[in-house]
From Swiss-Prot:
Entry's Gene Ontology BP terms: glutaminyl-tRNAGln biosynthesis via transamidation; mitochondrial translation
Uppermost EC category: ligase
Subcellular compartments: Mitochondrion
Protein name: Glutamyl-tRNA(Gln) amidotransferase subunit A, mitochondrial
Amino acid sequence: MSLLREAERCLVNRKAFASLNAFVTPLDRVGSWIERVKDADARRKRGAPKSSLDGKLIAIKDNICTRDVRTTCASAILENFTSPFNATVVELLEESGAIVAGKTNLDEFGMGSHSTYSHFGPVKGVRADDLGYVSAGGSSGGSAIAVATEQCYAALGTDTGGSVRLPAAYTGTVGFKPSYGLLSRWGVVAYANSLDTVGIIGANTSTVSEVFGVLNRYDHRDPTSISKATRSRIDEITGSTSKTRSERLRIGVPIEYNILELDPFVRETWRKSIQHLKNQGHTVHPVSLPATKQALSAYYVLAPAEASSNLAKYDGVRYGTRDLDSPDNTGGYLYARSRGSGFGPEVKRRIVLGAFSLSAEAIDNYFIQAQKVRRLVQSDFNKVFRLHNPLLQATLTSHPKALESDGDTAEKVDVLVCPTAPSPPPLLCSLENAAPTEAYTNDVFTVPASLAGLPALSVPVTPGDREQESPLGIQVIGQFGDDQLVLDVGSRLEKMNIQ
């Protein structure tokens, strides 16, 4: 099939699934992109494509800046904002020949777990018979639905505490959060700087790997981008240990993830996924991550604290839509009404929560303690992986000792395998009267990897005896920089029939 025909098929699907509300700003049916796709077709026929993404439609989450399309963050305060520049990841996609397929819907400023907190209306998952629509997950729900319904080849999202992996788990797609700092954040509207990661959603791990290969570049404009020297060291460490680990991997199963609230179908899918890897010749080992129990609480202190600082600039003066001054505004705050009407309820909730945790009265008891928990979470992961964390000082002097981490390496594992979400996607109607904080628990399995900055992948798995059921997300977590191994293990789960 020609690239132009593929693009036209995506547009047909977009019209067919318009009710799911995946896009804030869709790609126009006519425009200069058509000629670019035709040029890509010609290059492919000559055997000289720019990349494997040449001429492919890639959707962009609407909190990633694009010069030619508005960037709203699904918020009223940025409803008419158009960036004067492209984000680095968008630049890299366009240099590879990819076509921006529009901007996808999300929870406002990336704050949510079901993509319902959007100024442009909620994103809807597939219908569950006569019960209504199910959740598409959040906050990158629009990107996930766009991929799941073949409205694009792949999509970019952002993952702060699971915002790419959870939608992937709910929509039967593959969602990948790379190691923190590998993909540039320059041009990505910040939610929580120390956690935000550009993620990739695709129909399979092969597609995700293609996009990752294009975007995995150092960017001098991003102060959190991993330097070229560190990238070389990571490549040397992971390359030198790949032969040591060989094809027989040690698969870790975190015992703390087997919680009482875990849905029985999710638990059974997890068990069969582990058995499937065991049948392939890999060994399975229980591991303990004790700080995991405090990870979710720490996350919902740290992320809102950073958000309250990042969102202070949206006042209608420097950024954002300016609302009319209120006649009863006796406090003299020029921006009070602009922020009050511009932000939605969940964003306001997190701003207040973050401002409190950073206050002089609370910072020691909340923010500082949460930072300590974060370090404990990172330490727990470092203790269970055979590969030493390349960012630690020990690797600076002698990378051949990369496997000599704390304790006996024979007892350590290569990757962790666990559920992505504790339950299948809920019905949207069931969320209407639920307490806002109930949605926070959906991130319980995704937050730990985010706090530690580790690569994590959600792949759809359907047990062979439950093929009538929608697939569930199984998560693969690896050591920092071991992104390729995470993708490899994910492909083994994805391709095989789990019995």
